[in-house]
Amino acid sequence: MSHKKVERIDPLTQALPCVGCDSHAHLDGEEFDADREEVLARARAAGVATIGNIFLDPDRWRRRRGYFDAHPEVFFVLGIHPCDGQQCTPEVLADIREAFAVDDRLRAVGEIGLDFYWDDCPKEIQYQVLHDQLQLARELEKPVVIHCRNAEAETLMTLEARGFVGYPLLWHCFGGDADMARRIIRNGWHISIPGPVSYPANKA
């Protein structure tokens, strides 16, 4: 069986026809230390007007937020990833709360959720950390960015049971089926489209 070669788009010659938003980036990572400015410039050239940078703990936010001082197009999201749930102590939660109090570029709590693909954190701890951070988001009146992998039903049930239907929420890197997408949209939430949708083996 022959395979048709997929022609790749050059983002610098075929920029978005209207402004776009990259809702989920980790540009504070060490892997960008050599060319962060060039990456941000290429994003602008491709039509990306707004970028959400996710800080995975308050210490990273504190040490690396300054990388974006000259880039008002970058907003911040802060939370404890489910795989790092064992690090989410009451002191860390208090630190996150304080960060939101002093930095108006912090716009959402995330990425938080459940990840049953990796075995980095016991499930019961992940549930507790998710509950704690959902409560914090309500307290701060901030939207939520959800990370979910191999735990779609559990994450949906948790959010619905805790009264988050209609709450401002972005389901990051959505990988579910059409029925799940419809349920998320009915709940008043948003979905971000991940890179894997471009893989030839994936179907709409």
Region annotations inferred by a language model:
Residues 1-204:
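Mid-domain alpha/beta scaffold segments of enzyme catalytic cores
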